[in-house]
Amino acid sequence: GAVGEIQILLNNIASQLNGDQKKADKV
């Protein structure tokens, strides 16, 4: 459903933000 798709998009954005934070921590 639409709600599920939105949740997936939010999860993808969250994972991308987490990845950016991890990269920043490494620097």
Swiss-Prot record:
Coiled coil spans: none
Domain of life from the UniProt record: Eukaryota
Spans traversing the lipid bilayer: none
Compartments, as annotated in UniProt: Trichocyst
Main location: other
Cellular component terms per the entry's GO annotation: trichocyst
Homology family: Belongs to the TMP family.
Function field: Structural protein that crystallize inside the trichocyst matrix.
Protein name (record): Trichocyst matrix protein T4-C
Originating species: Paramecium tetraurelia
Name of the gene this protein is made from: T4C
